[in-house]
Amino acid sequence: MSVVSSVTVKVPGTTANLGPGFDCIGAALTIYNQFQFTRLEESGLIIQATGAEAERVPTDESNLIYQAFAKLYQYIDQPAPGVKIEIELGVPLARGLGSSATAIVAANRLAGEPLSQAQVMALAIAIEGHPDNVVPALLGGCRLAATGASGWEICDVPWHSHIVPVLAIPDFELSTSEARRVLPTEYSRADAIFNTAHLGLLLRGLETGKGEWLRAALQDKLHQPYRQALIPGYDAVNTAAVAAGAYGMVISGAGPTLLALADVSHAAAVEAAMSTAWQEAGITAVVRSLALDTHGAT
């Protein structure tokens, strides 16, 4: 394919971990960022952002979207061209809702698609460091990723149509580095077995929509117990969500966004309860009932 002068990519926000699936499972949601990359005739970088928290977007080479763009050109051993990047933000920054590494989809198209989809995926995972956000953002749906003998093995995780993701996005940030810092360097065998068993139960619960399995499955001993203290109001929001009928609540990615899963018949009540709980805790938050995005980056 020939080199093009401008490309636009729409990328869904993602939620990762889903409780016990630490660093290996994620789902694409119906909330989006849009990136337009236009090749400049001369060297240089122009970054313009609109939408949610646009004023906080870096407009120099420290911008993570630009860094992902440049990484692709480095990978194919070509100098990155001058580029204008227009960002339409629908997914707030630093909230545990996705990865800027997905910008390499646009970079690949702008370069004439020198990389296959599998190569783009592998490079995005390498940039991000783990697959749980990148994979569903690129492919859509709920995805599980694990390393195989010859690279990443990625499988689709069936998601029952009655399961609604309810997303609660607070107005404060939590850096991934801080969320990683509080994690222990070693875990007990009992905790490892606990998460393995509950991840299996989660996969079957998502497929069948069976409430008993989902209520039990949305537990974790590897990351959430250590990160909850970094999120003001966590306990109150969790209690409110479950009381309103949610199967359970988890931290989305590294946080601070919280995700509840609920049957479609309880989603509205869960959304209202989570909103009220955070409001009573003195924290402004946007709470939305969403759906699974099945297309990924387009």
Curated annotation (Swiss-Prot):
Its EC number is 2.7.1.39. Keywords: Amino-acid biosynthesis, ATP-binding, Cytoplasm, Kinase, Nucleotide-binding, Threonine biosynthesis, Transferase. ATP binds at P92, L93, A94, R95, G96, L97, G98, S99, S100, A101, T102. It catalyses: L-homoserine + ATP = O-phospho-L-homoserine + ADP + H(+). It is found in: Cytoplasm. Pfam families: GHMP_kinases_C, GHMP_kinases_N. One of its GO terms (biological process) is threonine biosynthetic process. GO terms for cellular component: cytoplasm. InterPro entries: GHMP_kinase_C_dom (IPR013750), GHMP_kinase_C_sf (IPR036554), GHMP_kinase_N_dom (IPR006204), GHMP_knse_ATP-bd_CS (IPR006203), Homoserine_kinase (IPR000870), Ribosomal_Su5_D2-typ_SF (IPR020568), Ribsml_uS5_D2-typ_fold_subgr (IPR014721). GO terms for molecular function: ATP binding; homoserine kinase activity. Disulfide bonds: none annotated. It comes from the Bacteria. Pathway: Amino-acid biosynthesis; L-threonine biosynthesis; L-threonine from L-aspartate: step 4/5. Its main location: cytoplasm. Catalyzes the ATP-dependent phosphorylation of L-homoserine to L-homoserine phosphate. Belongs to the GHMP kinase family. Homoserine kinase subfamily. This is Homoserine kinase. The lineage of its organism: Bacteria, Bacillati, Cyanobacteriota, Cyanophyceae, Nostocales.
